[in-house]
Amino acid sequence: MRDVNCVGIVMGFDFGTKHIGVAIGQKLTCTAQPLTVLQSQSGVPNWKRIRDIYNTWKPMIFVVGLPLKIDGSEQPITILAKIFAIQLKELFPVPVKMHDERFSTSEARLNYFKYYHDDLCARSNIKINAIAAGVILKSWLNKS
């Protein structure tokens, strides 16, 4: 297993039952950017696509957003995100960290215009979920 204190590439996930946002980042520079949005079938991730992305980027760490209520308590999606993190840990030889994602979607919506400042950009495949994954990853990078 790779060292959590590495300076390599890290991958972040914004887990959802319909969509999973994916972002890629660099621990050395503490930067993160949205990568893609994956479709889920009834809450089941597309593991083949996740494996393909993993093989392309070879991240040293996975960071999964932990969806908590505003007061910090868990909600039904929290359990599903934890299960997703456990599955990642079982399927891939890299550490998996969970990171509080409260307000990440709100921040992603604010950042949306950074990526979609005109109609041409609005047709891009990068969606709010991928931007939220980038927000989660950037927050984790800043705290790690």
UniProtKB/Swiss-Prot annotation:
What SMART domains does the record point to? YqgFc
Keywords per UniProt: Cytoplasm, Hydrolase, Nuclease, Ribosome biogenesis
Top-rank EC class of the record's enzyme: hydrolase
Pfam families found in the cross-reference section: RuvX (PF03652)
GO CC term, one of those recorded? cytosol
Q: Which GO terms describe its molecular function?
A: nuclease activity
Any GO BP annotation: rRNA 5'-end processing
Keyword Nuclease recorded? yes
InterPro entries (UniProt xref)? RNaseH-like_sf, YqgF, YqgF/RNaseH-like_dom, YqgF/RNaseH-like_dom_sf
- From which domain of life does this come? Bacteria
* Keyword Cytoplasm among UniProt keywords: yes
Where does this protein chiefly localize? Answer: cytoplasm
Q: Where in the cell is it found?
A: Cytoplasm
User: Briefly, what is this protein's role?
Assistant: Could be a nuclease involved in processing of the 5'-end of pre-16S rRNA.
The UniProt entry's sequence similarity note says: Belongs to the YqgF nuclease family.
Put simply, this protein is called Putative pre-16S rRNA nuclease
**Which gene does this sequence derive from?**
yqgF
